């Protein structure tokens, strides 16, 4: 059982690493900054592969009542905001910077649980939230590659991620499984982004993309869709088999490896102050793992 869990964790880390680095390559190196098309393609591939997996009997999809589907639509709308704003932010920000800002969503979730749901929060989790918030708050002032648009889209991404987590927790228990929820997210995102591609200008703007007929662009886009699907699948499996503390530990491991390799593969200006922000954010996330492990033990 321990070997199986370790293999699952390593599979998740590999998918996490490959998916984020591939997306960063398409967005920042090839500069395919048309999120309605890029994310629409990824959700199309994800939905198609998930449907094929269901037909082959590899995953279970349940026939849900229309009322449950309608109740889930606000979460699907937030999912669109997550992937759209995340794509815009990642195209302009370094991967470690994006991760530090993304972690603020945990602060929003923690604050909502304590202030609105009146849940008991451990001291380690409060300290974790403060460290994550401090790291993200100091980073814009120390980032030598500061990009206002990148940070703006990161804020929208943070809000959508935090709201999605809160909404998802408030709907438990639900007849929709994690796979059912993701399938609905894929369908809703694919349809909405397809309709949005024309008014946003992405549909015709992409015709002027310089690498439109290059194999490396086609290969990278195909890889991003497939890797995104396997990342989703491995994440669902990880959360269904492992305790929350163990899941958080694997996610932290995946983020550290991905952030470290991204600094070697993509251009990034490092200063002592930015490294300090990264370390503070890492400490905050390590404390979050510790608090999750204590609460689940």
Swiss-Prot record:
Highest taxon of source: Eukaryota
Protein name: UDP-N-acetylglucosamine transporter TMEM241
Source organism phylogeny: Eukaryota, Metazoa, Chordata, Craniata, Vertebrata
Membrane topology per record: Multi-pass membrane protein
An example molecular function term from Gene Ontology annotations: UDP-N-acetylglucosamine transmembrane transporter activity
Effect of loss of the gene: Deficient mice are grossly normal and show similar body weight, total cholesterol in serum and triglyceride in serum with wild-type mice. However, Tmem241 ablation causes ectopic cholesterol accumulation in lung cells, lung inflammatory infiltration and hypokinesia.
Signal peptide extent: none
Originating gene: Tmem241
GO annotation, cellular component aspect: Golgi apparatus; membrane
General function of this protein: Golgi-localized UDP-N-acetylglucosamine (UDP-GlcNAc) transporter that transports UDP-N-acetylglucosamine into Golgi lumen. Contributes to lysosomal targeting of NPC2, a key protein required for lysosomal cholesterol exiting, and that utilizes the mannose-6-phosphate (M6P) modification pathway for its lysosomal targeting.
Tissues expressed in: Widely expressed with high expression in lung.
Entry similarity comment: Belongs to the nucleotide-sugar transporter family. SLC35A subfamily.
GO biological process, one term: UDP-N-acetylglucosamine transmembrane transport
Organism: Mus musculus (Mouse)
Lipid metabolism in keyword set: no
Membrane-crossing segments per the record: 7-29, 32-52, 69-89, 93-113, 121-141, 146-166, 187-207, 211-231, 250-270, 271-291
Record InterPro entries: TPT_transporter
Location of this chain's protein in the cell: Golgi apparatus, cis-Golgi network membrane
Keywords of this entry: Golgi apparatus, Membrane, Sugar transport, Transmembrane, Transmembrane helix, Transport
PANTHER family documented for this protein: SOLUTE CARRIER FAMILY 35
């Amino acid at each position: 059982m321990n070997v199986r869990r370790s293999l699952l964790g390593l599979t998740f880390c590999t998918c996490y690493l490959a998916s984020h680095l591939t997306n960063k390559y398409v967005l920042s190196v090839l500069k395919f900054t048309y999120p309605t098309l890029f994310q629409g393609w990824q959700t199309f591939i994800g939905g198609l592969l998930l449907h094929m997996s269901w037909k082959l009997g590899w995953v279970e999809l349940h026939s849900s009542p229309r009322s449950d589907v309608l109740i889930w639509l606000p979460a699907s709308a937030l999912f669109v905001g997550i992937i759209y704003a995340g794509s815009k932010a990642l195209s302009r920000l370094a991967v470690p910077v994006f991760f530090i800002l993304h972690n603020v969503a945990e602060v929003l979730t923690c604050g909502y649980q304590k202030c609105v749901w009146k849940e008991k929060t451990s001291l380690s989790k409060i300290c974790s939230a403060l460290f994550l918030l401090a790291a993200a708050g100091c980073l814009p002032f120390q980032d030598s590659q500061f990009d206002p648009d990148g940070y703006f889209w990161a804020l929208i991404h943070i809000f959508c991620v935090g709201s999605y987590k809160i909404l998802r927790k408030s709907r438990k228990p639900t007849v929709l499984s994690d796979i059912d929820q993701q399938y609905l997210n894929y369908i809703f995102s694919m349809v909405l982004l397809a309709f949005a591609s024309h008014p946003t200008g992405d549909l015709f703007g992409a015709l002027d993309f310089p690498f439109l007929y290059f194999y490396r662009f086609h290969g990278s886009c195909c890889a991003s869709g497939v890797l995104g699907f396997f990342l989703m699948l491995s994440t669902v499996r990880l959360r269904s088999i492992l305790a929350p503390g163990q899941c958080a530990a694997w996610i932290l491991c995946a983020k550290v490896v991905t952030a470290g390799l991204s600094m070697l593969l993509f251009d990034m200006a490092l200063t002592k102050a930015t490294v300090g922000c990264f370390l503070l954010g890492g400490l905050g996330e390590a404390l979050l793992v510790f608090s999750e492990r204590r609460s689940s033990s």
